Amino acid sequence: MKKVLVFGAAGAVGIHTVKYLLSEGKYEITILDLKNKNSFSRLKRFKKRVNVLYGDVTDRVLMEALVKDHDYIIYLASAMPPLGNMKSGLSMTIDYGGCENIVRAINYYNPKCHLFFASTTSMYKNIKNPSVKSRITLNEFDYFDASKLESEKLIKSKLKNYTIYRIPLVLSNPLEETFMYHGNRDDDMDVITKEDCAYAFVRGINYAAVLNKQTFNLKTDTINYGELLDKLLLINGLSSKYLLSRIFLEKDYY
């Protein structure tokens, strides 16, 4: 039985990734996230069916212990904006630093392991119809995007087996989960549901050889960001997360 390790399992995409892996019925699954009230509540439902662990991707010793025993790794852990863009070192520590620990462990202990890495399409900025070959230009305050781009470069230069998914705005329940809410009201944005995003990671395992050493833009539809916020207000009412989406309306989105 192949072994799959999921980092960032308590997030909107992570939860559904675990569900889809279980539905396949052919994997031994280990999941990890930071231990807090929210992650404990969201992951406890899986404790009888998967190996549930709590820890930090910046813990090099822990990463080495976990990586050496798995065939596939799905890396979803991230310092999401706006938090990830508030301090220059935060995204580099979590997104890049965690990725660096995993890449190092794979090279040293498990070079056949295949890494599926969650990156972001927000690095494209205002490029029309971007492709994975589009030239990326970031400013000095794009901490989150920079950490993802540097992680991609590290993966491509060091690993033999990897697949990178650049993920657009993820549609999730803003009352229960982190809402990826950064954007300009007039922008048309590529979007994907949390379910479709998770499914792409899980199905990718079956086609790892075909997808190896490739980068993909994920999306299922395009939507106007202002219209999306209006619909969320209509459906869910006024919430703190909706207010945050308004406060940071001129920022880049994840």
Predicted regions and their residues:
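Glycine-rich NAD(P)-binding loop of the Rossmann-fold in SDR/ketoreductase-type enzymes
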Residues: 58, 90-101, 138, 142, ...
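Conserved Rossmann-fold NAD(P)-dependent oxidoreductase catalytic core, especially the SDR/UDP-sugar
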Residues: 100-143
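Mid/C-terminal beta-alpha module of Rossmann-like enzyme folds, strongest
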Residues: 203-254
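N-terminal Rossmann NAD(P)H-binding glycine-rich loop of SDR-like oxidoreductase domains
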Residues: 4-24
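Active-site Tyr-X1-5-Lys
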Residues: 126, 139-163
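NAD(P)H-binding glycine-rich loop region in Rossmannoid oxidoreductase-like domains
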Residues: 51-97
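Flexible, glycine-rich beta-alpha linker
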Residues: 124-125, 142-143, 163-182
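Glycine/proline-rich active-site loop of Rossmann-fold NAD(P)-dependent oxidoreductases
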Residues: 149, 172-182, 194-195, 204-216
